[in-house]
Swiss-Prot record:
NCBIfam families in UniProt: PRK14429.1
Superkingdom of origin: Bacteria
One example GO MF annotation: acylphosphatase activity
InterPro entries: Acylphosphatase, Acylphosphatase-like_dom, Acylphosphatase-like_dom_sf, Acylphosphatase_CS
Keyword annotations of the record: Hydrolase
Reaction it catalyzes: an acyl phosphate + H2O = a carboxylate + phosphate + H(+)
Similarity annotation: Belongs to the acylphosphatase family.
Record-given protein name: Acylphosphatase
Acylphosphatase-like domain location: 3-90
Active site: 18, 36
Organism annotation: Shewanella amazonensis (strain ATCC BAA-1098 / SB2B)
Amino acid sequence: MRRVLIRVKGKVQGVCFRRFALERARELGVTGYVTNMDDGSVQILAQGSAPLVEKLIDWCWEGSPAASVNAVEVNEDEADEIYLDFSITQS
């Protein structure tokens, strides 16, 4: 099991990025959440098998059709909480 915090920067708010991230994560079977951040970025907590989490990280560079991604930062996360689904949360 791999668990990461992903920060996606660029034009990623107001372009349905979170909805598309939700759909992609659920397709992959990755759990966690996606949320808008006050600085205009989007944060994703993703947990699942390492290859599937890596696919979600790769997808972040594409994002939603209207998004323009400038940076994707990934940090390993060691928290104990287990997510059973993937959801959109409010910042």
